[in-house]
Amino acid sequence: MTMTDPIADFLTRLRNANSAYHDEVTLPHSKIKANIAEILKKEGYISDYRTEDARVGKSLVVQLKYGPSRERSIAGLRRVSKPGLRVYAKSTNLPRVLGGLGVAIISTSSGLRTDRQAAREGVGGEVLAYVW
């Protein structure tokens, strides 16, 4: 069965593993998912991620991050632009998540960027997700 929205599946698996206090989550690999995982790592939402070769294909293993008393570092994830309704933002009108405390992941012509990186570079694009 083909997947309609692999990014939403990625975010849902992260959300479910995070709410169940799993240490890591394994999911199908793709370049865009690896790029999103890289952004989440740089922003401090996950500890690490790695690519593993499985029997069928590659898989992406994301290690979730928790605080000293097991508080979650990811409070919420939300898919913004969906296959049925794409959401775009100009460089002058980029979204801010929780007044700058969260991160908007934006697909630009120069790759995936956070809202702050896109504003600094002066580029807009498709708003993929919010993370806080």
Swiss-Prot record:
Disulfide bonds: none annotated. The keyword Metal-binding does not apply. InterPro entries: Ribosomal_uS8 (IPR000630), Ribosomal_uS8_sf (IPR035987). NCBIfam families: PRK00136.1. This is Small ribosomal subunit protein uS8. GO terms for molecular function: rRNA binding; structural constituent of ribosome. Part of the 30S ribosomal subunit. Contacts proteins S5 and S12. One of the primary rRNA binding proteins, it binds directly to 16S rRNA central domain where it helps coordinate assembly of the platform of the 30S subunit. GO terms for cellular component: ribonucleoprotein complex; ribosome.
